[in-house]
Amino acid sequence: MTSLLQVRDLSVHSLARPILHTLSFTLEAGKILAVIGESGSGKSTLALSLMGLLPAGFQPHGEIRLNDENLLTLTEPQWCQIRGKTLGMVFQEPMSALNPTRRIGAQIADTLRLHTTLTRSEIRDQTLALMEQVGLLKAGVSERAYPHQLSGGQRQRALLAMALACKPALLIADEFTTALDARTRADVMALVHSHTKTHRMAVLMISHDLGLVRHHADHVLVLKDGICVEQGPTASIFDAPAHPYTQALLAMSLHGAAHTPLSRLPVYTVPV
């Protein structure tokens, strides 16, 4: 069976400096893959590569196949067709994606307007349904509210509603639970899990929260200096890590150092 997402020998360079080195992995429909590693390991560069949003000067090489289509060959208009429809995105800081001058309901509706043939009334109904799903209506948030009138957690819920609006095949979630309180984090992850089961949505989740990763991810990929040092089923990675870097990373979490910067981990040289 062909995987939903196939990444083969993906390398990214910036001004001749390598950031990702021949990275390869697959992701099945309905599964969650967590990418972990210290800051600067290449996690966000991977996410931006998958979304076609690399900054100018960053050169990707290799293959990123989604539904067997090589995304690295797409033009920008073609990328615009799949972002928000086949490919959903949620970022760590919602205000980097939300327009501060437009109402929340209108921004959620934009995704439906761009990628569906729903009527105006159907779009409004679906917008309200999405706001209900992510818990905004229950929290008393109106579709006419502006982003600055929402709490950080509510903004993240609004961004998730936009990302899930068209039932994407793949959701890229880059540190999207970092700023959330425990209750909101649990609610958001429950909603994501619901979509993996009911819509077979795959999720690539970038996180420093190893407890969250262990509880929710099906597979884990460990990045160090742009290189995958280890990947496999979550239970295998957490219970029997093979690489010294992975062992140190998990040991820190186990010993109550979850909030210690990963940059303080022992240094291991990874051959290029």
Label every model-predicted segment.
Residues V213-H215:
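A short, surface-exposed alpha-helical micro-motif characterized by mixed small hydrophobic
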Residues S3, L137-E143, Q231-V272:
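Short catalytic/signature loops enriched in Gly
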Residues A145-L150, Q154:
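Conserved ABC ATPase signature
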Residues Q59-N70:
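Conserved ABC transporter NBD signature motif
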Residues A165-A169:
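A short, proline-enriched helix->beta-strand linker immediately N-terminal to the Walker B motif
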Residues L71-G88, A106, L114, S236-P241:
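ABC ATPase NBD coupling module
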